[in-house]
From Swiss-Prot:
InterPro entries: LytB/IspH
Residues the record lists as binding isopentenyl diphosphate: 43, 81, 131, 226, 228, 271
GO terms of biological process kind: dimethylallyl diphosphate biosynthetic process; isopentenyl diphosphate biosynthetic process, methylerythritol 4-phosphate pathway; terpenoid biosynthetic process
Residues at the catalytic site: 133 (proton donor)
Residues where dimethylallyl diphosphate binds: 43, 81, 131, 226, 228, 271
EC number(s) recorded for this UniProt protein: 1.17.7.4
Full protein name: 4-hydroxy-3-methylbut-2-enyl diphosphate reductase
MF terms (GO), sorted A to Z: 4 iron, 4 sulfur cluster binding; 4-hydroxy-3-methylbut-2-enyl diphosphate reductase activity; metal ion binding
Gene: ispH
Annotated residues for binding of (2E)-4-hydroxy-3-methylbut-2-enyl diphosphate: 43, 81, 131, 170, 226, 228, 271
Function according to Swiss-Prot or TrEMBL: Catalyzes the conversion of 1-hydroxy-2-methyl-2-(E)-butenyl 4-diphosphate (HMBPP) into a mixture of isopentenyl diphosphate (IPP) and dimethylallyl diphosphate (DMAPP). Acts in the terminal step of the DOXP/MEP pathway for isoprenoid precursor biosynthesis.
The species this protein was found in: Geobacillus kaustophilus (strain HTA426)
Amino acid sequence: MEVIKITPRGYCYGVVDAMVIARNAALDPSLPRPIYILGMIVHNKHVTDAFAEEGIITLDGENRLEILEKIDQGTVIFTAHGVSPEVKKRALEKGLVTIDATCPDVTKTHRLIEQKLADGYDIIYIGKKGHPEPEGAVGINPERIHLVETIDDVERLSIHNERIMVTNQTTMSQWDVADIMAKVKEKYPHVEMHKEICLATQLRQEAVAEQAKEADVTIVVGDPRSNNSNRLAQVSEEIAGTKAYRVADVTEIDINWIKDAKKVAVTAGASTPTPITKEVIDFLEQFDPNDPSTWKRERKVPLQKILPKVKTKKEE
């Protein structure tokens, strides 16, 4: 079996930055304890488990404001997905120390939205309902920011404003965003369009669209809650025309998916730890459909290998 290692794949700079920020917090004795992460720092359970080993508590719930109410003292880290101004204000009121690990691309979209709102615009925001990134963006002004996920959602919009802007969650499928933006333009011809797919997402999607074409099946290594991982599987099927399966790690691979394949493509979401992806690639490279001894799928990556290394200050 040939394994096509799709490039680029895996970690993006926003994810690495967020994890480094959180690791540095864990190593800083001056920060008040406990240290909490408001939601999953990035959407990957291996990462949150690794942070738990370092004494950082991940709290999850329906929305960021609700999670925040569970915290009475200590330090709170905002995740890479960003938070609304209301969450920041409430954390301040509660006297918590806050650390912002928001991805710079998400911050850029927030700034754009704030500027357009100040100029009197209504905002149409294309995003995944229930995902924390749209929650943070829409939370800037829920009255004037309209969340849409599908073309049907656009049909249901009723905005009476000459000033309208459309933008999007940074990890959406660029093809879905283009289709939805076209529908918005059809309904509101005067709309101002700002496509905000981050470059890392765009490059990874384009790599799958092109490189997965030759494969019989694509394996996407990523957490079930990772929107960008799920979109990579979607791109493989809808754009490259190759059946795709998303797995959290090597243990989730079904032999039936790969036993008849001559070529298997592998990619990984932007929040997937590199050692987890390597384990999948190593398994596929040694797999022989005629030799059951090669079928064993076992995760052996230790938690201490999951997080990126950080430089610690040497004592003088």
